[in-house]
């Protein structure tokens, strides 16, 4: 298609005030030039539908520039998986599409409501489905999280995570779906020709993955006991929150539940295996079978947890009862998940879904604090892998730590702690003591 035609079509569509844009090809692979040449984009508005091929540098620059010029203040860009489109143009052509108008990504909004639909085929289908989302009872919460968390991830943070890469004998890239997992966490899978999945790095991969240059090292920061602290904050359980103030949550929990000293790492590890699982629905039989404890001991553990932490247990149990009645549940921040069966899963949804948003919010904070200093290599749930030049290591560690432990506006007065490790190789990461 001639560049003048691309510009003409975009101008005509944006003159209507709102344009739906999506990839015809699904997820676009910026790691493979031959696949990239097949890229096509659907444009649809009240005046009709067009498909625009973007098969070389010239057409890519014309297309991106035309969108940036046309989508000015007051215009609406209606999208399906806009994050992947940004990543494609950055990774393949080095072009960052920035718009002044309003971006509405239906894939994100529907996913937050656990609606599993395919990409709309037209502007009119998009608007019909958007209307349904906006009529939902949780729209105000959905919209707030979309603007506060999802938009920054779509426009800046996740495209950078996807395009920054990591080295072996070649550069590999991770692909993320921002609301891909049912409990709100990002989903990562191999969508590219040259890709890896940070969530399931094998021992063999750990041996060969390395930073982007010889002067850099890995810095890994991750939250400690996040779900226990989130459970305490959400349920307002004084007993849980008292545990969270202790030096070691699991050691204190073990001693509180079993009334004996937690004087070995094995005992602490045992507590980690049953504490949250009981809240999430594990029975005494499950503890006995999976952990190997006698049935009487397992029954005593379950009873003690229910009695000591009665406030939080009743709170989390209410989510299961709600799921049994309504066949769905809504978390603290308005995310909806359907439960046609296995209603007990509403228990961990009640905690893990808000925890996922907390981690994504802090990913945004971390990105903003480091953007003039270094880059984030990848994100795995409550963990963040960061690149650091050796001469900037102390600054990167302190800046990252300050960002991650600072208060989150969505969860006032909830404070987390993090651990840190550093290494040139993932198999040689050494723990670093952080300031309190």
Regions found by a protein language model. Name each.
Residues 305-319, 391-436:
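Polymerase palm active-site segment centered on the conserved acidic dipeptide of motif C
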Residues 25-38, 42-47, 143-262, 322-370, ...:
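Acidic, glycine-rich two-metal-ion catalytic cores of nucleic acid-processing enzymes
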Residues 90-91, 96-166, 235-244, 311, ...:
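Mixed-charge, glycine-rich, non-catalytic linkers/tails in nucleic-acid processing enzymes
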Residues 291-301:
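Short, basic interhelical loop/turn and adjoining N-cap
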Residues 103-105, 269, 302, 377-383:
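Short Gly/Ser/Thr- and Asp/Glu-enriched loop/turn motifs at secondary-structure junctions
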Residues 113-116, 132-134, 283-292, 384-400:
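Catalytic palm subdomain of template-directed nucleic-acid polymerases
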Residues 2-4, 14-134, 225:
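Conserved DEDDh/DEDDy metal-dependent 3′-5′ exonuclease domain
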Residues 104-105, 211-227, 278-279, 287-293:
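Conserved catalytic palm subdomain of right-hand nucleotidyl-transferase polymerases, strongest
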């Amino acid at each position: 298609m001639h560049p003048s035609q691309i510009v003409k079509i975009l101008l005509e569509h944006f003159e209507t005030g709102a344009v739906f844009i999506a990839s015809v090809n699904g997820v676009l692979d910026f790691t493979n030039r031959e696949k990239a040449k097949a890229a096509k984009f659907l444009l649809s508005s009240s005046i009709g539908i067009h498909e625009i091929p973007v098969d070389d540098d010239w057409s890519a620059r014309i297309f991106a520039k035309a969108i940036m010029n046309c989508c000015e203040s007051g215009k609406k860009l209606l999208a399906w998986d806009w994050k992947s489109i940004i990543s494609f143009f950055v990774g393949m052509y080095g072009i960052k599409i920035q718009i002044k108008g309003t971006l509405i990504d239906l894939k994100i909004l529907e996913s937050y409501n656990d609606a599993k639909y395919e990409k709309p085929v037209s502007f009119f289908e998009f608007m019909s489905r958007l209307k349904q989302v906006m009529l939902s009872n949780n729209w105000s919460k959905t919209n707030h999280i979309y603007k506060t968390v999802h938009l920054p991830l779509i426009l800046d943070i996740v495209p950078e995570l996807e395009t920054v890469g990591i080295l072996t004998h070649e550069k590999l890239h991770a692909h993320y779906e921002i609301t891909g997992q049912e409990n709100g966490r990002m989903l990562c899978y191999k969508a590219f020709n040259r890709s890896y999945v940070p969530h399931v790095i094998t021992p063999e991969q750990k041996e060969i993955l390395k930073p982007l240059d010889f002067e850099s090292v890995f810095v890994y920061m991750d939250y400690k006991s996040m779900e226990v602290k989130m459970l305490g904050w959400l349920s307002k359980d004084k007993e849980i929150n008292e545990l969270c103030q202790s030096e070691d949550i699991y050691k204190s929990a073990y001693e509180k539940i079993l009334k004996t000293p937690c004087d070995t790492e094995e005992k602490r590890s045992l507590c980690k295996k049953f504490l949250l699982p009981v809240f999430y629905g594990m029975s005494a039989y499950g503890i006995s079978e999976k952990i190997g404890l006698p049935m009487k001991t397992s029954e005593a553990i379950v009873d003690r947890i229910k009695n000591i932490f009665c406030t939080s247990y009743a709170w989390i149990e209410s989510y299961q009862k709600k799921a049994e009645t309504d066949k769905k549940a809504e978390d603290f921040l308005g995310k909806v998940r359907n439960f046609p069966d296995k209603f007990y899963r509403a228990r961990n949804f009640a905690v893990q879904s808000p925890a996922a948003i907390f981690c994504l919010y802090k990913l945004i904070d971390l990105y903003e604090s480091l953007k003039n200093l270094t880059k984030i290599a990848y994100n795995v749930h409550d963990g963040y892998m960061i690149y650091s030049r050796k001469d900037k290591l102390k600054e990167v560690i302190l800046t990252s730590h300050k960002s991650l432990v600072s208060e989150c506006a969505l969860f006032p007065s909830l404070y987390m702690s993090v651990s840190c490790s550093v290494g040139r190789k993932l198999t040689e990461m050494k723990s670093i003591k952080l300031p309190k």
